[in-house]
Each structure stands twice: as structure tokens, then as C-alpha cells.
């Protein structure tokens, strides 16, 4: 699982690619993106909530990243 850190007040920018089609969900921010099979999806979200949040494959609850938003 990847561990990523962003500063509050900036942007959370993450690219997710996959061989299979999945819905990827970022908890805490409650945003999701569909990743097509063999493709990728881009997350770009204002980093306005501080804390540690899990990004996961929604249907299987498999975590793919831990997103930390720290004071800027």
C-alpha cells in the first residue's frame, strides 16, 4: 500500500491505473473515480480536511493507498 502525504490547503492529486475495471474510493473526502480496465483515473481534490484517509477498491475494500493531509 502506498503512503502519500499532502499539505492542507493544497491539492490531493493521485493517479490510479489498473489492469481490471474498478471503482476507487477516497474515504474522508467521499469521492470516487471509475478506473477502466487497462486505463487510469485521476483524483484531484482540495486538501481541506486534515487526517489520515484510506483509498481503496470499493467493491472489495482492498486498500491501495493511505493519504495523509498534514498542516500546511
Locations of regions flagged by a protein language model:
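N-terminal edge beta-strand
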Residues: 1-11
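Beta-strand-rich interaction surfaces with strong enrichment in secreted/lumenal proteins
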Residues: 2-4, 30-34
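Surface-exposed loop/turn positions
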Residues: 8-10, 20, 39, 51
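Short linear motifs in intrinsically disordered
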Residues: 11-15, 42-45
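Short proline/glycine-enriched turn/loop motifs at strand-loop junctions of beta-rich domains
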Residues: 16-22
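Short, surface-exposed beta-strand/strand-loop-strand elements in extracellular ectodomains
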Residues: 23-30
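Extracellular/periplasmic metallocenter environments
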Residues: 35-72
